[in-house]
Amino acid sequence: MWSQFIAILSQSMPIGVCRKYPVCQTHLKKLKVADLSQESKDSEMAAMTEYISSNRPWGQGSYPSNGYVSPVSGCTLHFGNVSTLHPDSAALDGRLREMAEVLGVQDYASAPVRVSSTGYIDKVKAMVYEIDGVESMSMADLMGCTQLHQLAGKVASDIQSGAINHREFAGEILSNMVGPLRELLPKEDCDSIVSILEKVRDGEAVSADEVFPIITKFQEAGF
């Protein structure tokens, strides 16, 4: 899949585009290094998949105003700029639609339809248990598991795109996961998480001062 991905990306950014928009050349050069790790390749494809999924419709001249930030090259690409500079916009659209298909983005030409999040957590849990050997993985293995990172990206994409109602999702987490959380986390931390989720569920504003202490604790714990 990586070779297809790179080939399509290269065809989308021919030398004429790279000369006028140098960030394209820098991006391609960093992705084409001979010793690029599989982890980096997976990370790049997952990021592009999430970007396309979150910014549909994709192709046919419809490109988002926000740029794609590559986790590997560090470059920010604006595909609207690429389209403007490309000598054949129809060919570019074809290549980028092909990229969406190769990456497995569903309904890439349509805006996402919001659905109820009821049962979403159960679906995610089922996908987690489909990962080979997940039940016997150590914490280090779980943290480095590419499939789990991709699944987390999908959940984030579903929320950001509006495919999942964040208020319903927060309510579902409260209904399904608070019990197990209380068994794993100190009472103070769990109470803080519950308070944040309840505010999201009820449509109330959540301040950064409420969220940052929780994030910091998880980071200190190695998450």
UniProtKB/Swiss-Prot annotation:
Stored InterPro entries: DUF5875
Give a Pfam family name: DUF5875
Q: Which domain of life is it from?
A: Viruses
Q: What is this protein called?
A: Uncharacterized protein 096R
